């Protein structure tokens, strides 16, 4: 657990993370590991094992929150919500008590990325799914996360959950 004396309070990197006059360019190189029913990538679907980190300010993250709710995965997949702002380093849990995610014990999502990849060179994006035993990011591939909720987490879908990715409609 972090204490006030060990937490970073340097907010000097707050502010815009895009250059004035330039469009936001989302990092599209994702951590593409998958959480699957059979665990073929080393990450099996297990109730209570993972935490979805999704900021409401991010449209890519909102689709995972919507899918989770529609499918009834609330009891098997917890959610951490960073605040609506992002500094140059990472999304922060500034809205949580003490500025720390209550489950992970992290003040920045970046810590989950570095727990798995100490020299992670890319953008720290949401949504991200974090493995709770290791507190390390598993994936941040927003498109695949949503598809996997629909196709790999079916054992945990609520009764009457919609089929969000019908086999007949797949390419």
Question: Residue locations for each model-derived region?
Answer:
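GST-like domain detector, emphasizing the conserved glutathione-binding G-site
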Residues: 2-171
């Amino acid at each position: 657990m972090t204490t006030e004396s060990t937490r970073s309070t340097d907010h000097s990197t707050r502010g815009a993370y895009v250059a004035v006059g330039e469009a936001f360019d989302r990092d599209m190189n994702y951590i593409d590991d998958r959480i699957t029913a059979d665990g073929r990538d080393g990450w099996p679907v297990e109730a209570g094992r993972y935490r979805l980190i999704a900021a409401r300010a991010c449209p890519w993250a909102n689709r995972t929150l919507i899918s989770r709710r529609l499918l009834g995965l609330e009891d098997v997949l917890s959610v951490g919500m960073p605040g609506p702002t992002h500094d140059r380093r990472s999304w922060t849990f500034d809205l949580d008590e003490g500025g720390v995610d209550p489950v992970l014990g992290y003040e920045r999502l970046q810590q989950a990325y570095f727990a798995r990849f100490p020299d992670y060179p890319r953008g720290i994006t949401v949504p991200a799914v974090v493995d709770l035993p290791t507190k390390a990011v598993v994936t941040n591939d927003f498109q695949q996360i949503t598809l996997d909720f629909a196709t790999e987490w079916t054992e945990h879908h609520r009764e009457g959950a919609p089929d969000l990715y019908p086999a007949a409609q797949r390419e």
